[in-house]
Regions:
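Polytopic membrane enzymes that build or remodel cell-surface glycoconjugates and lipids
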Residues: 2-165
């Protein structure tokens, strides 16, 4: 006969809960995330003085008729028409929204790209916060590295590269 294992009479090991960022507990991480986002915004602020480039911006923005019509037919066209042999309907939709707000004012397109990059950086912070069991320093460090990494510069400062954001 097989021997039965003796059950340990000690305390059961506690279940480790993954921290969750909630609206009621935002003060704890905002003091880590806000400086990261502010620094990234300041780094990209000079971009607002840039204009459109002679590369793809002419085809994606300045000469793109899809941006001018946000009617139902215009939306159908955005979601069914490739631009420069690429199919990026959400990018074209965001450029069309930009066009509706400020037509061909380059700084508004750059500002939108910066804000999209800041949102992505905040999402990286949140993701790492979840993975690191709530370590705010690690989350802030990784988010800062993501936000200022040279690999992302082209996506933020070149309007037609918004598709990479």
């Amino acid at each position: 006969m097989a021997e039965q294992r003796k059950k340990s009479k000690g305390k059961p090991s506690p279940i480790k809960k993954t921290p969750v960022i909630t609206s009621s507990g935002t003060k704890g991480y905002i003091k880590y995330l806000a400086p990261v986002l502010a620094l990234i915004f300041l780094i990209f602020l000079p971009v607002l003085r840039n204009g459109f480039t002679n590369w793809d911006d002419i085809l994606y923005v300045t000469n793109n008729l899809l941006l001018k019509d946000l009617s139902l037919n215009g939306l159908k066209a955005i979601f069914s028409t490739p631009v420069v042999s690429n199919y990026h309907p959400l990018t074209i939709l965001s450029l069309a929204l930009n066009y509706q707000m400020a037509e061909l004012t380059p700084w508004s397109y750059h500002l939108t790209s910066i804000f999209l990059h800041l949102i992505n950086t905040a999402l990286v912070f949140w993701f790492i916060f979840q993975l690191s069991s709530g370590n705010k320093w690690v989350s802030a460090s990784v988010a800062l590295l993501f936000g200022i990494h040279p690999m992302h510069v082209e996506s933020v400062v070149w309007i037609s590269e918004r598709k990479d954001l």
